[in-house]
């Protein structure tokens, strides 16, 4: 079959990793696959099957217009036109939608086009954008249950608007785009699926639970980390507690990892490693090692494998890939029972506390044992059995086949 994947990212950045896995798997199955992506703010992809739809200037101009007018997803006519034209010329059997925000297309316009022209569509919900107004994450807002009517508590946050709350207008545009769409299936992890089924926008649509895949075979697996441990000057007797998060993004919750480390400052057998620490303010705690953003997936896997425990204090992730990747590298999990995080693994491999309960999180960290080879192998086996690309994409391929048969 002919498959067109649409995602803001095409390669290693964020959901681009999943897009790349989708592309490779479907190609290996003999399908004809193309990827339409934004094409800026990530490394160039030298593959003719990858088609950038946004020019070099349009994403930036559209972002500024969105900030000023509040019309997120309305300010990218040229990229949207290119995407529609490419879809018409390629004429796919399946259109696979991933992340449609990120200042690169008018998503409601494209979905309306797909609806009007009777394309078969699978929309994978890697966040909550499919059933929200302008927002990719709901946080404490429940307007998605009844429809966005204004008064958006996230107006000044991504995708932000300096002056105007257009959330109701954007929600209405999505509602019109979805209306009467017969040949669309929505997929996503359990937490997202539950909310999508209750949402005003997607209530009554075909919504199926599907986890997000990770590349365990070539990258995220247990490995020898003594060289990294030596380079970071971590004593052999210390337990290593790792997080991977963008410190400058409050949604990732890095501050709570540091607060837990501060509570445990007197425990002499712990070293905390914060990967993704991208702010200028130094960490003064002597038992905390900060590492800036790591772009190499191989190096990132070493940090995951280094940990005796991986901590995730994210406040909004629907299915935190960092947790799945850490499990694949043989490291058990701890963190907040927030959003989709507790859906990642059962209690045999993870311990989650009430959100913001730093003393409880610190207690979990303090009591964690050093990781044994048997523990590492068990974590890896669970991750592979549930999240391996061949497992997820075999299910996705069956969804494609069911759409074509409609």
Model-predicted segments: where are they?
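Conserved donor-binding/catalytic core segment of Leloir-type glycosyltransferases
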Residues: 214, 235-252, 258-261
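Donor nucleotide-sugar binding/catalytic pocket of nucleotide-sugar-dependent glycosyltransferases
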Residues: 130, 145-225
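A short, well-ordered alpha-helix in the C-terminal region of glycosyltransferases
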Residues: 373-386, 395-398
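Aromatic "clamp/platform" in nucleotide-sugar-dependent glycosyltransferases that forms part
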Residues: 315
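Conserved acidic donor-binding segment of nucleotide-sugar-dependent glycosyltransferases
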Residues: 347-358, 366-371
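Nucleotide-activated donor-binding/catalytic signature segment of Leloir-type glycosyltransferases, i.e.
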Residues: 276-301
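Short hydrophobic beta-strand element within catalytic cores of glycosyltransferases
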Residues: 332-335
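Short alpha-helical donor nucleotide-sugar binding micro-motif in glycosyltransferases
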Residues: 302-307
């Amino acid at each position: 079959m002919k498959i067109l994947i649409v995602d803001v990212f095409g390669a290693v950045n964020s959901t681009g990793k999943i897009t790349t896995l989708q592309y490779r798997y479907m190609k290996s199955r003999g399908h004809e696959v193309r990827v339409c992506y934004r094409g800026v703010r990530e490394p160039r992809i030298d593959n003719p099957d990858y088609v950038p739809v946004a020019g070099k200037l349009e994403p930036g101009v559209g972002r500024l217009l969105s900030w000023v007018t509040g019309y997120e997803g309305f300010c990218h006519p040229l990229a949207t036109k290119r995407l529609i034209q490419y879809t018409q010329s390629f004429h796919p059997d399946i259109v696979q939608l991933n992340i449609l925000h990120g200042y690169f297309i008018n998503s409601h316009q494209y979905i309306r086009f797909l609806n009007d022209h009777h394309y078969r569509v699978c929309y994978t919900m890697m966040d909550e954008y499919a059933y929200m107004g302008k927002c990719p994450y709901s946080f404490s807002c429940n307007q998605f249950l009844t429809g966005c009517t204004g008064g958006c508590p996230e107006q000044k946050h991504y995708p932000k608007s300096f002056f105007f709350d257009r959330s109701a207008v954007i929600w209405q545009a999505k509602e019109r785009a979805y209306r009467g769409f017969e040949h669309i299936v929505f997929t996503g992890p359990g937490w997202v699926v539950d909310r999508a089924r209750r949402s005003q926008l997607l209530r009554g649509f075909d919504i199926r639970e599907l986890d997000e895949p990770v590349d365990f075979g070539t990258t995220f697996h247990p490995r020898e980390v003594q060289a990294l441990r030596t380079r970071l000057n971590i004593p052999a007797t210390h337990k290593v507690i790792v997080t991977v998060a963008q410190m400058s993004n409050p949604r990732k919750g890095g501050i709570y990892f540091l607060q837990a480390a501060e509570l445990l400052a007197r425990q002499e057998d712990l070293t905390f490693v914060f990967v993704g620490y991208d702010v200028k303010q130094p960490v003064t705690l002597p038992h905390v090692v900060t590492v800036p953003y790591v772009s190499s997936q191989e190096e990132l896997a070493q940090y995951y494998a280094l940990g005796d425990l991986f901590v995730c204090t994210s406040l909004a992730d629907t299915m935190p890939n960092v947790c799945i990747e850490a499990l694949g590298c043989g490291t058990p999990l701890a963190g907040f029972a927030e959003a989709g995080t507790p859906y990642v693994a059962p209690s045999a491999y993870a311990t989650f506390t009430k959100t913001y309960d730093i003393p409880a999180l610190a207690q979990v960290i303090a009591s964690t044992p050093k990781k044994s080879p048997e523990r590492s192998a068990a974590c890896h086996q669970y991750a592979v059995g549930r999240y391996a690309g061949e497992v997820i994409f075999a299910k996705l391929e069956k969804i494609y086949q069911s759409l074509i048969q409609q």
